Amino acid sequence: MGAGQSTDSKALGTSPEEMSHILARRFASKCFTPLELAHLKDNFNSLALKQGDIRYWNEEVLSRFLGIPDGNGKFGDGDLDAGPVIFRMVSYLGAFPFQNTLAPSVLTFDALVKVIVLLTDRYGKVLRRGKKDRIKLLFGSLADVGRKEELPVPDNESKDKPDNTPNKSGTQSQTAGFSIDKPSNDNDDEEDNDDDDLALAALESLDAIEVFKHDQRIDRTVYEAHVSFDTFQRLLMLLVVLAPLRTNEETSQYFSQLNEDSMEAARRCVENILTSFDIGDRKSGIGYETFSWVISSSLPYIFDPLTPLFEHLLFSKNLDLSRRRDSGTSSPSEEKNAAPLSSLTPSKPSITLSGSFESCILDSAIISHLSFFLPTSSPIPNLLQNGTRLHGVFSSDTHGESLTSFSHNVLTWDAPSIMLVTGAKKDPSGDETESITIGAYIPRAWKSSTSASASHHDLSNQFQLPYLFQLSPNHVVMQGSPSINSLKANRPMVSFSTKSGIAIGCKIPPPTRTSLSSDSSRPTPAGGGSLLIDPALENAEFFMSNGLSHEEGVFLPAGAATWSPSHSSSTAASETIHISIYNIEVWGIVHTVTISKHSSSKHSRSSTANGAIPDAIMRQQAHWNFEAREAERRREIHLNVGGGDSEEQTGRALLEMAGIIGSSSRYR
């Protein structure tokens, strides 16, 4: 009781503007290093516009500094002009935690501090809860939750924003620039998660939770507002292009080298992703429930590129140049051309290691798409940010369409891998229709027999679970079941057989002499999804289920990608897509840096204990060298036996008894 009274007295008479300023100062002192804060201040002050006593950035300044398209239509029809969308987001986030009152905010230094902290996930140093609420905050910034067109600008800012200032056009013009559905009713029935946990945590840290709790109480508008597909499409285009971005890289390099082919690939990728949000008429936009569920379940890392983008604000070229001048190590011409940020040529994805085959499937857009949902390490799951590199293991276009070639290249790879398959859907009559791209993430080595798949797997980290997914024409993700260790031995993660082909997530029947050539020996679907590729590598069956039509399997149902989370079906539903295969590629995952000292992975380059070869590529090459030596040894034995027919038969019999050749060979 006494604590509540103390809280009230502390916040009594304090306005939201003052509390917002206090929070910004707390963020600045606890979430940035002194050097980062000095760089941020230099960047802001060197470009800030001024009206009276207010220093601020407008949309043009922010877009120019970040190096993102600002609506000038340079990139085709403007679907990559994300500057207005980004400024719309920051003018909402800058009002945190008083979005309902202060949004849209003027982008002052305080507002910019809060924007950077929220978009780079640094708020954990100040706010001890509200982690899950970031999605709600991002939805609000896109859906314009809390903005009121009639809301006057605060008195201390209205005088400093005449009608012809860029700042006014950068905030108010955007309100009418995007189609946002407004609430159709004002139901007062509250849900359990109506509280904005992140805003509550901010108020709690300011000892003002009781006084200002009513301001951040999320009303029904957050659940009834919608993000227009046009708004989200522009943001997605930016995220796809900048997915490989690192903090020390210039964003302009990613845009300057875009051509029509890469733009078209990015558009296709964005359209495929948008299908997972499309549960009705696109004119109505994306609701909060759909947005939150799809992001959480199938696109958890989609906003990761915003972190390095806004961390650019923490590096000032001016301060770097001043250091060079003070040290006297650079000439005036060097100072003019010097830039602390490195360049990257995004035309060839740097994630692929040299020496790999020329991919028929992988491009920058596909890699970006994979990075939005596929965890490959811990604690940094994003494959474009955690040092992951891809090594070409198998390509049907390069190595041939045969199980022998697949076996030679894939079964000798003992590290995690990603398999990608492209082809065309086949209708019931067998005719090819639209193209499709599917794939699977296998977090451990492939096995040729199902018996080895019954071993216990360490599932302490998300990246140790398998994934089955569809990239086009729809975005569908089926995550591996956390209870995979409790599954029966006839439900392996992967299975390889010359009789049935390649099976992922299928139920494998027991082998019998009478069923070797019958359908009873064929793998069958299980769980939420499975993939079966025939021995000729020509056709595939991609199976998806809501989990009620089959027994538990390796993969969970696809979730929001195929059904609404609030209206889960109680009846069995499944779909089998028949595919005519064009290309199959398997890419091995190699970690070029040590991600975690506590990682249980055996495939790190740092794992050299007991003389183990530390690199999966080297281990595979060593295995091939061993096979080559054994083949040479068998050839020499054959030649030494003699050339006669009877002698040749005798020599062959000796080799079979030794287990070197024949059906019981150890080297097959």
UniProtKB/Swiss-Prot annotation:
Q: Which domain of life is it from?
A: Eukaryota
Presence of the UniProt keyword Cytoplasm in the record: yes
Q: Which UniProt keywords apply?
A: Cytoplasm
- Cross-referenced PROSITE patterns: TLDC (PS51886)
> What InterPro entries does the record point to?
TLDc_dom (IPR006571)
The Polar residues compositionally biased stretches are 164-177, 513-523
Sorted alphabetically, which SMART domains does this protein's record hold? TLDc
Which parts of the sequence are annotated with region: Disordered?
149-194, 323-344, 508-529
Please explain the role this protein plays, according to its UniProt record.
May be involved in a process influencing telomere capping.
* Pfam families per the UniProt record, alphabetical: TLD
Protein name as it appears in the record: Restriction of telomere capping protein 5
- One Gene Ontology cellular component: cytoplasm
The entry's localization annotation reads:
Cytoplasm
**Organism source for this protein?**
Arthroderma otae (strain ATCC MYA-4605 / CBS 113480)
Q: Which family does it belong to?
A: Belongs to the RTC5 family.
> Ranges of Basic and acidic residues compositional bias?
149-163, 323-337
- Major location category of this protein: cytoplasm
The residues covered by the TLDc domain are: 360-590
